[in-house]
Amino acid sequence: MSHQEPEAKIFACSQSVHLAEQIAEKYGIPLGKVTFSKFSDGEFQPSYEESIRGLRVFIVCSTFPTADNLMELLLMIDAAKRASARHITPVIPYFGYARQDRKDKPRVPIGAKLVAKLLETAGATRIMTMDLHADQIQGFFEKPVDHLFASTIFLPYLKSLNLENLTIASPDMGGSKRAYAYSKFLDSDVVICYKQRKAANVIGTMELIGDVQGKNVVLVDDMIDTGGTLAKAADLMIEKGALSVRAICTHAILSGDAYEKIENSNLLELIVTDSIPLKKESKKIRVVSCAPLFAEVMHMVQNNTSISGKFLM
């Protein structure tokens, strides 16, 4: 008797509906119906408005802002489990708490590990995410993790710019692996910024390792938070003789006065995905959607086909 995969349905947490609608459209099915009730004390309760018994359920939820979205996702996973869904895959374009991947000082938690345990305890049978801040977070899970790379969608855009004398730059030492991966596909040089922080999100000094004289520079990073690092790196590149400076960052957190920093910086363009909705528009920010990538990989998961071809890094 042949084995037939269960039907798939896609649902979304309340703050990821727009992205989920695009994913569902690319996938070729309507977005599933779910309602969210909120009690007077602030508690919320999701409810699936259609049967999911025996089905493969994808739940799209970027966990930013972190606390409420994560709790909402956990409740949706639990509800799907109790409604007898056969497979439950949280699709987490931006994985919150990923910066807490180790103990970097005494008496602090490993938040990413805790989140992994919570997702699995709630009932997740597979995890799908994109550009984790630290690759080793995949090892925090016992269930399979499909870790996608935004390079799949960024590289075609970069190639379309036809930039001469292109140089890829990492804004810090930790991102050098990512920078070298991009340079491999673009056949370009690499430079690295060495920074020393005074405190979290506060940069002390920054120095450049490499030459950018007469080059068109593209900074690559997994996220942009306050924007301080990229703004300072762009200023440094121009100071060292770069012709232009762009940046590609998968996750646009853009907290505090980040928009103002970007507008006032030497960055010609900031390219991001829609893993996190932008708070406002900016003439310097270009959004490249990750919806087609997620829809394609979700199809591959549904059909039990290899997704290794989607990994460019």
Predicted regions and their residues:
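PRPP-associated nucleotide enzymes
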Residues: 1-313
